[in-house]
């Protein structure tokens, strides 16, 4: 199955793309995709403190099981104070 991963903000500078397609096996989770993305883009910060993970427009946990055609958006945290 295939899912899509969208990059936002400064992530696009690291990945040099807006999104990628990822081929998964049935039963794989958000965390599996994040591990794949981290291996492909080692300079990309994907810790819970640096980004929010959204699947199909809903904030989710890393243990969520993915389905074909799911869309993951990785949203970087912006500022603080």
What does each model-identified segment do?
Residues 1-80:
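Ubiquitin-like/PB1-type beta-grasp interaction modules and other compact soluble beta-rich domains
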């Amino acid at each position: 199955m295939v899912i899509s991963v969208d990059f936002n903000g400064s992530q696009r500078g690291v990945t040099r793309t807006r999104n990628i397609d990822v081929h998964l096996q049935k039963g794989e989770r958000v965390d599996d995709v994040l591990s794949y993305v981290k291996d492909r883009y080692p300079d990309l910060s994907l810790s819970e403190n640096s980004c929010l993970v959204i699947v199909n427009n809903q904030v989710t946990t890393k243990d969520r099981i993915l389905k074909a055609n799911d869309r993951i958006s990785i949203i970087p945290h912006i500022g603080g104070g």
